[in-house]
Structure formats: structure tokens, C-alpha cells
């Protein structure tokens, strides 16, 4: 059964209800691209207004209150130099007691309405867009993912897993498949909910419960999953940009939340299982006879059997899936050898290099006044300069360090594990090769034209993202050029430190803020583009890593996906719902999914706090804490 558009006009919300109000307000909000254009204009205004008013903020650095280290007997521990060793003092809540020390000269906003500012806005427009870290990443990743989706690999894999699942564990498996379907673009929304509904009815369970479980997994579990996705790269890129407002050397990898995502997938599976079997399905069963009257004749069994039969894999599809999975194992195995074998190309530490052989640097370059750095033969970017200072704000070098007149430095990645610099090519090939294998075996890939069309399919899916990203890039870079990003980060971070709000409360409050934002701004990328430049630096000021802030964001972004009227996939799910409940409207769908949203919020946020107190890293090289290194 293909779910496309609802037949006829679906019933509206009950007039005057809260959901109707949310829908009306959401419909009046500007589209994400327009929203970022408006935000960019607001930054321009406040950059000029702040400069005129003489705003200034004192930069600070995070430090800890230090106390002498003592041994088990209570005696002070001495260092090799004979001096007492100091360690951070820990408060009653188990957190290190934070302090903020002044650093350097006060920051002042730089107006974008001066001659230099206006010139910069026009001259940097293209560079702002093309220098977005996430742009190339999501573009390349979606080439492989889109091709695999176009030739049917993802659809066949989900159908095979769902149809092979025993009745006793049908709910958790459906939810878990949904939570991992974000890697397959929108295939999870289109394939899994109608298939789950048919499977539930075929085994004598309420089909709407199957629909709800699948939708909860796909939408509500969007932030979880066992596999890296293009969306992870988008979040990493924006998190890194935001982090470098405070720390120019900070890097966020695409796998920054991998461990937490994997754990979250299990949590979402268990929570979805609980809600479906204990709350949603018992409620549905009370009105099952009336709702299903006339569906598929004889209780719907014959029609649903036909649906399941139509979704069963053909012999050719089974063969294609076997070959695709085998090639996936080969690709990942080859990369595993390249990473693990000593002396192999991806083994050890390294840094990216440019085409002309120069090593890509991250640390600022010390230059003399008036110097310029050539980025390409056709372009030279002039930089303003400032003294080289240490963390205490003292001048340590008579030379001058590069300081961008634009938004953010063009200096790229720091040295690290070689494999960490090739995550995107690994994702690209891990989906491209199996997708091609499946297409060749099943006959969906027959020619070069088919291959190119498969690549086009992935690019088409991100065209809206590119449009949003252009205006988002202007907003983010205007914010940075004006200096308002650093001023807001230092001011907000200082307030948080002075308020001494418990970190768990801060995390819960941030998750709730993202939940509220989901009713105003649709899309993971759009909301993160607004929130990351503000909250990631502020949380760093209280000693929490960008990776932790991103993990909290994933929860808030996911749990409301299943009930926000701004989710464009609601109409697809509604079409399936109306098959079993003729008078269903969006209000019916949202009331059906509300228990999932509430329970996911409570359990998933609790899981984040458990993870935080356990001290586990969120992913490879992804700590929970940020701060000065102390002994």
C-alpha cells in the first residue's frame, strides 16, 4: 500500500482548541529561509545600534577554584618541585566550582552599517555560503544515501526486517527500525507506517497501534540510531562553528554523539514499546469494532493479507538485498583494514593537505602588520591584526596574530586520527556501493543514465536545505562579524555561572526550550542554526561541551516531531490513519501520538541525565565537559 496524499479534505482540528491555535500560529510564521533573512537583518540593526550606544562586554575565561590535593590520610600531596599539588574544588552537587577570570580588553560590537561593514556583507556573501562546514558534507553523503534509496535498497531492507519479525516482539522491532530509518531520508515515513499497520492487523492487533509505533520510531526517534547520517554532519558543522566563538581550536566530529545515539535508540525502542502496548493499544481496542467496521471486509484480514503479500520481497529483491549487504560488509571491512593495520593509509595521526601539498593549518598564523594571506591565486583576503596574548590577556609575542575581518577563520582541521578526516567518504561509499549492487541485481540500475539519476535523487532531497543554508550562512556570519556572538556568549555565560544553576536543571531547561521551538520552527537544521550560536558558547562557559549541548538538542528536536503541526509528513501518516478511521483528522493523529511525545520527553531526558552522571563520552573524542585542563 502506498501512502501518498489523503483522499478528500481531511477534517480539521476541533475549532478553538490548543492544537488549532498551534496550527494557526505555525502557519503564520515565515518559512525557514525567510526567517534567517529576517534574523540577519536584526543582527545588522543591533550591530549598528550597539556600536552607537557603546555596548561592551568583558571577555572572561573559565577556571576552577583550586584547593590542595590530599591523600587518604588527609596529608597534602607534594609535587616533584616540592610544591603542593592543587586540584579543583568540588561542590556538594559533585560539580567542580567554576570561576570566571577577566581576559583581555572589553569587546565592542562592530557595525555592519559602516562603509566597511556594507562592503563586507556584499563581498563575503558567496564565501559565507560556500565555507559552511556542513555544506560539502551533507552534499557528498546524500549522493550515496540518495542513490541507495532511489534503487530501493532501504525500502527492501526495512520490509525484510519488519516482515521477518516474530509477533511477540513486533512492537519493539518496528520502533527500533523507525529510530534507525533517519539514515534513509524519508523512506521511513513512506514505507514503515503503512507496513506496520498491515502487519498488526494481520496478526490480530489494532492496525492504528502499528501505525503509531512506526511513526513514533521514525519521527520521535529521529535523534537516535546506530549509524551516522548526513544530519549528524550538519549538527557537527554548526556546533564546531559555535564552539569556536569561545575556543578557536575546538573541533566537533561527525561521530560526536554516536554512543549516545546508539543508547538513545534502545531507550526509544523500550519507551515506544511501553506506550504502544500499555497505553495506546488498550485505548484503541476499546473502540476497535466500530473503527474497523467495513475495513477490508471480514474485519480487514483479507485486504491486509493482500497488502502484506504486495510488500513481501520477490526472489530478485531477496537476491539483491543479499548482494547489497555483502558488498556493504566488504566496503566496511576494507576501511577497517585501512584504519587498523599499522602503516595503512588511514592508520595513525595525520592532517588534511591541500592540492598543492600545503598542510591545512588550524592555529593562527603570526604575521607582520599589513600583510595579506593568499587563499587562491585570484583572491587575497586582508586581515586586521591584534597582539598575541596568553590566556590571562598578557602580550606574549611582539608579532601580530591574524584576526579575521570577516566572520570566521578559513583555517581548517587540526591533526588527529586519519580515519576521522574521512568519515564522509566512508558514509558515501558504504551506501553507494550496496545501493549500486542492489540496483544491478534487481534491474533498477541498468545504465549510466540510471546511475546519474540515482545521484540526482539524493541532491533533489537536499535542495530545500541548500536554500535555507544560504540565508542561514549570512545570519551566522553577520552575527560573528559584528562580534555580537562573542558578546552574547560571554554575557550569557557569565550570568549562568553567577546564577550557579545546577547543570541537570540547565540541560532539562534547554531540552524544553527546543521542544517549544519545534512548534515555531520546523526542521532540525533551522532550529539548530538559531540556537547553536547562542547556547553552545554559553554552555561552554559553564564547563559543558558542545557535544553535550547537541545531545540535549537531539532530544528536544525529536520528541515533538510526532505532534507538531509543522511536520510536513503528518499528512502522509494521516492518509494511512484514515484508512482505518474514516473520520480522523490531524487532531485525531496528534492526540494519538501525544502519549509518545510526553513519555519520550521524560524517559529520554532522564536517560541524558543518567549518561551525564555516569561520565561516559558521547562519541569518539566527544567529552561531556569543557574547561581548562587541570591535574
Could you describe each region identified by the protein language model?
Residues 140-150, 168, 174-187, 217-225, ...:
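Helix-loop-helix module between adjacent transmembrane segments
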Amino acid at each position: 500500500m502506498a501512502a501518498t496524499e489523503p483522499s478528500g479534505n481531511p477534517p480539521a482540528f476541533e475549532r478553538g482548541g490548543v492544537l488549532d491555535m498551534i496550527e494557526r500560529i505555525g502557519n503564520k510564521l515565515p518559512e525557514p529561509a525567510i526567517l534567517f533573512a529576517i534574523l540577519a537583518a536584526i543582527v545588522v540593526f543591533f550591530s549598528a545600534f550597539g556600536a552607537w550606544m557603546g555596548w561592551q562586554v568583558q571577555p572572561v575565561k573559565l577556571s576552577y577554584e583550586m584547593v590542595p590535593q590530599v591523600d587518604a590520610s588527609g596529608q597534602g600531596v607534594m609535587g616533584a618541585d616540592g610544591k603542593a599539588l592543587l586540584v579543583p574544588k568540588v561542590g556538594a552537587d559533585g560539580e567542580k566550582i567554576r570561576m570566571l577570570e577577566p581576559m583581555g580588553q572589553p569587546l565592542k560590537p562592530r557595525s555592519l552599517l559602516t562603509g566597511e561593514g556594507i562592503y563586507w556583507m556584499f563581498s563575503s556573501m558567496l564565501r559565507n555560503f560556500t565555507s559552511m562546514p556542513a555544506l560539502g558534507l551533507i552534499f557528498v553523503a546524500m549522493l550515496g544515501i540518495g542513490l541507495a534509496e532511489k534503487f530501493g535498497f532501504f525500502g527492501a531492507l526495512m520490509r525484510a526486517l519488519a516482515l521477518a519479525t516474530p509477533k511477540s516482539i513486533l512492537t519493539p522491532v518496528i520502533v527500533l527500525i523507525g529510530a534507525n530509518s533517519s539514515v534513509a531520508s524519508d523512506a521511513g515515513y513512506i514505507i514503515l507506517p503503512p507496513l506496520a499497520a498491515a502487519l498488526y492487523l494481520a496478526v490480530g492487533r489494532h492496525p492504528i497501534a502499528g501505525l503509531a509505533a512506526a511513526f513514533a520510531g521514525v519521527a520521535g526517534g529521529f535523534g537516535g540510531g546506530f549509524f551516522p547520517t548526513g544530519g549528524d554532519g550538519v549538527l557537527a558543522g554548526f556546533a564546531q562553528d559555535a564552539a569556536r566563538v569561545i575556543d578557536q581550536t575546538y573541533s566537533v566530529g561527525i561521530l560526536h554523539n554516536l554512543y549516545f545515539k546508539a543508547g538513545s535508540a534502545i531507550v526509544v525502542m523500550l519507551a515506544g514499546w511501553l506506550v504502544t502496548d500499555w497505553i495506546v493499544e488498550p485505548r484503541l481496542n476499546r473502540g476497535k469494532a466500530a473503527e474497523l467496521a467495513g475495513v477490508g471486509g471480514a474485519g480487514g484480514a483479507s485486504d491486509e493479507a493482500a497488502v502484506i503479500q504486495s510488500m513481501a520481497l520477490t526472489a530478485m529483491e531477496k537476491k539483491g538485498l543479499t548482494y547489497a549487504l555483502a558488498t556493504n560488509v566488504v566496503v566496511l571491512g576494507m576501511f577497517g583494514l585501512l584504519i587498523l593495520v599499522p602503516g595503512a593509509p588511514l592508520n595513525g595521526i595525520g592532517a588534511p593537505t591541500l592540492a598543492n601539498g600545503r598542510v591545512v593549518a588550524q592555529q593562527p598564523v603570526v604575521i607582520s602588520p599589513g600583510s595579506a594571506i593568499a587563499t587562491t591565486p585570484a583572491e587575497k583576503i586582508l586581515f586586521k591584526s591584534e597582539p598575541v596574548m596568553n590566556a590571562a590577556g598578557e602580550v606574549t609575542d611582539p608579532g601580530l596574530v591574524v584576526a579575521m575581518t570577516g566572520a570566521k577563520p578559513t583555517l581548517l582541521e587540526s591533526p588527529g586520527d586519519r580515519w576521522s578526516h574521512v568519515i564522509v567518504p566512508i558514509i558515501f561509499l558504504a551506501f553507494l556501493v550496496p545501493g549500486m549492487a542492489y540496483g544491478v541485481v534487481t534491474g533498477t540500475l541498468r545504465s549510466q543514465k540510471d546511475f546519474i539519476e540515482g545521484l540526482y535523487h539524493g541532491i533533489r532531497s537536499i535542495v530545500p536545505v541548500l536554500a535555507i543554508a544560504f540565508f542561514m550562512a549570512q545570519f551566522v556570519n553577520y552575527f560573528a562579524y559584528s562580534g555580537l556572538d562573542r558578546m552574547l556568549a560571554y554575557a550569557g555565560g557569565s550570568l549562568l555561572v553567577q546564577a550557579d544553576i545546577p547543570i541537570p536543571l540547565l540541560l532539562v531547561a534547554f531540552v524544553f526550550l527546543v521542544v517549544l521551538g519545534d512548534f515555531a520552527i520546523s526542521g532540525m537544521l533551522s532550529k539548530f542554526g538559531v540556537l547553536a550560536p547562542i547556547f553552545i558558547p554559553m554552555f561552554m562557559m559553564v564547563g559543558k561541551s558542545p557535544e553535550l549541548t547537541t545531545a540535549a538538542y537531539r532530544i528536544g528536536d525529536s520528541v515533538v516531531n510526532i505532534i507538531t503541526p509543522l511536520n510536513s509528513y503528518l499528512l502522509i501518516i494521516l492518509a494511512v490513519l484514515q484508512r482505518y478511521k474514516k473520520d480522523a483528522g490531524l487532531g485525531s493523529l496528534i492526540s494519538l501520538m501525544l502519549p509518545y511525545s510526553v513519555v519520550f520527553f521524560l524517559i529520554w531526558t532522564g536517560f541524558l541525565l543518567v549518561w551525564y552522571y555516569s561520565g561516559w563520552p558521547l562519541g569518539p573524542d566527544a567529552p561531556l565537559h569543557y574547561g581548562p585542563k587541570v591535574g
